[in-house]
């Protein structure tokens, strides 16, 4: 292995290059440093210069990418990878004359140089230009019909733009020529599973849903999608072409294969433009992600990509998409965490001028999630100081080929370094209190201490959020609930935005519920569920409490939030149906009764009867009759179903001719 070689010779340039390539594949920030180490030993190592050029291009550092590519070409004027980087930069800058000149130079040296077009296609993908990737791959195939890699790149990108059958044909051709390509094999295996999926259409969407989950997910996803499209279209003054294809995978490994070809992708969803792919709620542990906000986020990308002609930088579209989540529903979208504020205080967050690096080449595991939230705050600040229209004008600037510094100057009237300083001030303004309450931790602070030690530390540090929360948690876990309350209240006062697991809201709600103080418990849970989009158990608990307090509408709203976290618990839908019956919202009750049936209840006769009753109360006698007959097919002696059928017949007999 490369590591074994480096143990013998720590300066072996090819081993360093191999490590750099592995790091590039894994998205690790060490890739560039390893390539530079290889060049320190051998400055003429063309492949290392090309690798650095690719990394700079991916980070949208175009001038640095050109310099690295030109260094490679000084040693080898025919280096296809370097020519591909130069051609990509010219292509992205809309300099078609220079682009075609580079392509001509490359093909004069090697008329069948598919590597050039393969490289162009792959770099188009890195810049989210999927349609262009298809065209470049087609050019490669036209040059050499036996370039199996080119056929594979073509097929993968045809799938990304929704050309499913054409993509399959290209991938099968690639596999016949090279049956050892793992990416191609995995993707073909995934396509074979599509026969188990159902296509569910709505007005502007085509949902590709796993058969067993289709009826449950479609009941919520279809109306959510149409609502999101309308709201985003109104905000952006733009309407993506329809139908938009949405693929929802019950296996995260399958989602990873669909998006990158290999299992292991950490994302929840991906937008290729008018094709979206995402995890089903069944692909993750309950309470770990919100599939409703994930869909809204990915659809927002479809608008941003379309408006900018797929030229929006990663940091800006991610920040805007998180902002759109927050606008969509209370609690949706990333929220501030103690770890984020600690990273800010430790100067581990990137300046806005380098924020893209946090997405494409993170330096530590949490940096991607921190960058999502930071980017949303940047967009929030821009909207506050320059108006919502400024965000639209920035998208237009990117569409016109401007880089981030130029967009800041032209649209916001500031250079990006000055904006960095404004963002620093905004962080203090927005989170001044919590920032002051996040203190540096020492080894002594983080050791497991007993309740009395935790209380002593918290008493000495009344303005330290972590010390207060630790004291409250430790006392809570020790069963000393009354003593825990003042520490939890103080922690909440110091950092009211924090609502993660084990937050003050969570523990206080449990304390008040145990004591029978349901109103105080409800108040804590209402605040927590307004901040935490993944709080499934807390929403269910809040619903139970609000129902006890005589608030069926509030109880139903809490369960609606829970549905977008995990919709596959049958008891949740039975409760929600009963709540909508109490509030007289019979169409929603019908939806819930249909979902109960989709989840295969033990007593299907009862489930059909309850559906029939909901249809009857909603005024749909025909659907009620069909459902009650299904109940009687299963249980012919079901008395309540028989009585309902008689009521339906009686109502039908008294309905004027032509009535429903």
Give residue ranges: language-model regions:
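Short coil turns that delineate tetratricopeptide repeat
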Residues: 10, 43, 77, 111, ...
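Juxtacatalytic substrate-recognition/specificity segment
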Residues: 7, 33, 40, 67-68, ...
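Conserved structural position within tetratricopeptide repeats
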Residues: 3-7, 37-40, 70-74, 104-108, ...
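Pan-zinc metallopeptidase signature
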Residues: 352-470
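Structural signature of tandem alpha-helical TPR/SEL1-like repeats
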Residues: 1-4, 24-37, 58-71, 92-105, ...
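Helix-start (N-cap) detector for alpha-helical repeat units in TPR-like alpha-solenoids
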Residues: 13-14, 46-47, 80-81, 114-115, ...
């Amino acid at each position: 292995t490369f590591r074994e070689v480096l143990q013998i010779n720590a300066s072996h340039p090819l081993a360093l290059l191999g490590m750099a390539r592995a790091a590039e594949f894994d998205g690790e920030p060490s890739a560039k440093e390893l390539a530079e180490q290889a060049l320190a030993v051998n400055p003429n190592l063309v492949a290392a210069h090309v690798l650095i050029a690719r990394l700079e291009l991916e980070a949208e550092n175009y001038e640095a990418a050109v310099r690295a590519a030109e260094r490679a070409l000084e040693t080898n004027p025919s280096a296809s990878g370097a020519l591909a980087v130069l051609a990509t930069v010219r292509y992205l800058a809309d300099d078609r004359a220079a682009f075609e000149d580079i392509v001509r130079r490359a093909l004069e040296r090697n008329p069948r140089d598919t590597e050039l077009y393969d490289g162009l296609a792959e770099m188009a993908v890195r810049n989210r230009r999927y349609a262009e990737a298809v065209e470049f791959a087609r050019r490669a195939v036209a040059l050499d019909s036996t370039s199996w890699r080119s056929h594979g790149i073509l097929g993968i990108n045809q799938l990304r733009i929704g050309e499913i059958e054409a993509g399959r044909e290209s991938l099968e051709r690639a596999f016949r020529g090279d049956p050892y390509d793992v990416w191609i094999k995995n993707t073909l295996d995934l396509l074979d599973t599509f026969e188990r999926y159902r296509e569910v259409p709505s007005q502007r969407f085509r949902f590709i849903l796993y058969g067993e989950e289709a009826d449950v997910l479609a009941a919520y996803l279809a109306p959510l999608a149409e609502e999101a499209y309308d709201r985003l279209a109104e905000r952006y003054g733009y309407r993506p072409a329809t139908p938009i294809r949405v693929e929802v995978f019950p296996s995260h490994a399958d989602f990873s294969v669909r998006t990158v070809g290999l299992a292991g992708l950490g994302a929840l969803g991906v937008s290729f433009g008018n094709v979206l792919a995402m995890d089903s709620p069944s692909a993750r542990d309950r309470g770990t992600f919100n599939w409703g906000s994930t869909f809204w986020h990915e659809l927002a990308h479809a608008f941003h990509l379309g408006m900018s002609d797929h030229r929006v930088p990663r940091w800006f579209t991610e920040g805007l998409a998180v902002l759109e989540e927050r606008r969509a529903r209370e609690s949706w979208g990333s929220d501030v965490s103690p770890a984020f504020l600690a990273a800010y205080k430790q100067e581990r967050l990137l300046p806005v001028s380098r924020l893209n690096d946090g997405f494409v080449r993170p330096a530590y595991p949490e940096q991607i999630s921190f960058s999502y939230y930071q980017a949303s705050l940047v967009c929030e600040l821009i909207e506050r100081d320059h108006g919502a229209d400024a965000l639209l004008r920035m998208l237009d600037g990117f569409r016109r080929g401007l880089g981030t510094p130029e967009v800041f100057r032209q649209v916001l009237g500031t250079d990006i370094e000055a904006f960095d300083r404004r963002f620093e001030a905004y962080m203090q303004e927005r989170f001044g209190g919590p920032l002051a309450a996040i203190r540096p931790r020492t080894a002594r602070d983080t050791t497991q201490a007993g309740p009395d030690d935790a209380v002593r530390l918290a008493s000495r540090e009344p303005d330290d959020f972590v010390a207060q929360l630790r004291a409250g948690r430790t006392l809570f876990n020790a069963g000393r609930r009354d003593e825990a309350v003042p520490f939890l209240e103080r922690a909440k006062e110091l950092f009211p935005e924090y609502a993660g697991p084990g937050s003050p809201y969570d523990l206080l709600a449990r304390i008040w519920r145990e004591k029978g103080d349901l109103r105080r418990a409800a108040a804590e849970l209402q605040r927590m569920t307004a901040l935490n989009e993944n709080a499934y158990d807390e929403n269910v608990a809040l619903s139970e409490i609000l129902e006890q307090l005589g608030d069926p509408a509030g109880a139903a709203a809490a369960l609606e939030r829970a549905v977008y976290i995990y919709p596959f618990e049958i008891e949740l839908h039975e409760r929600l149906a009963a709540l909508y019956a109490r509030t007289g919202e019979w169409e929603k009750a019908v939806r819930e009764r249909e979902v109960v049936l989709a989840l295969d209840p033990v007593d299907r006769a009862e489930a059909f009867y309850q559906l029939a009753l909901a249809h009857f109360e909603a005024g749909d006698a025909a659907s009620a009759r069909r459902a009650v007959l299904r109940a009687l097919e299963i249980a012919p002696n079901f008395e309540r179903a028989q009585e309902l059928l008689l009521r339906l017949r009686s109502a039908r007999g008294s309905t004027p001719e032509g009535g429903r």
